[in-house]
Amino acid sequence: MKLRWFAFLVVLLAGCATKRDYENPPWNAKVPVQRAMQWMPISQKAGAAWNVDPQLITAIIAIESGGNPNAVSKSNAVGLMQLKASTSGRDVYRRMGWSGEPTTSELKNPERNISMGAAYLNILETGPLAGIKDPQVLQYALVVSYANGAGALLRTFSSDRKKAITKINDLSADEFFDHVAKNHPAPQAPRYIWKLQRALDEM
């Protein structure tokens, strides 16, 4: 009997741990947000130009680089908003009608990096994520798509974009988060939403 109870307890605890895996390791948003806030004047300017909430931009800066304009990741994402020249950078250049992609030095320039990051968020919102009605669900969808691609997110709902958007519009923000936690192939996707909320709460 004791052995059976112990086995049940182990399974229960394992389930609880798995449910909140996105909170590990712990992340304190206070210092990253303080450092990201120093760029708020640029974020406000870029947000106005691209119709993006400056607080969302600031939260992404806090999460991605901790406010360090010279940050470079192992995957070669660069600057405050950790943009990759060959993907998001190229998409922004295309939107602007330019050829090629941004240089590393350009991406390390705070004003250029934030402007391109805001532009990329606008590309996501008006492109693959167009049609999402709930503002908070859209915000969650934006950050997951920013980090892991819009296609990966939409495919967790349907291979057809319109059907995926329809299904997303049936969900509350909490339900959307639960869906991402259970179905997104990237384990960091729900963690990004969790970090977003912590960063916004610090502002």
Swiss-Prot record:
List the catalysed reactions: Endolytic cleavage of the (1->4)-beta-glycosidic linkage between N-acetylmuramic acid (MurNAc) and N-acetylglucosamine (GlcNAc) residues in peptidoglycan with concomitant formation of a 1,6-anhydrobond in the MurNAc residue
Q: Lipid attachment of type N-palmitoyl cysteine occurs at which residues?
A: C16
Query: What's one GO BP annotation on this UniProt entry?
Result: peptidoglycan metabolic process
The record's SUPFAM superfamilies line, in alphabetical order, gives: Lysozyme-like
User: Which keywords appear in this protein's UniProt record, sorted alphabetically?
Assistant: Cell outer membrane, Cell wall biogenesis/degradation, Lipoprotein, Lyase, Membrane, Palmitate, Signal
One GO CC term on file: cell outer membrane
Which E.C. number(s) belong to this protein? 4.2.2.n2
Q: How does it sit in the membrane?
A: Lipid-anchor
Instruction: Outline what the protein does.
Output: Murein-degrading enzyme. May play a role in recycling of muropeptides during cell elongation and/or cell division. Preferentially cleaves at a distance of more than two disaccharide units from the ends of the glycan chain.
Q: Which residues form the signal peptide?
A: 1-15
Q: Which family does it belong to?
A: Belongs to the transglycosylase Slt family.
Q: Which gene encodes it?
A: emtA
Protein localization: Cell outer membrane
Q: What is this protein called?
A: Endo-type membrane-bound lytic murein transglycosylase A
What HAMAP family has UniProt attached to this entry? EmtA
Cross-referenced InterPro entries, in alphabetical order? EmtA, Lysozyme-like_dom_sf, Transglyc_AS, Transglycosylase_SLT_dom_1
- Locate the lipid attachment (S-diacylglycerol cysteine): C16
The answer to whether keyword RNA-binding applies is no
**Gene Ontology molecular functions:** lytic endotransglycosylase activity
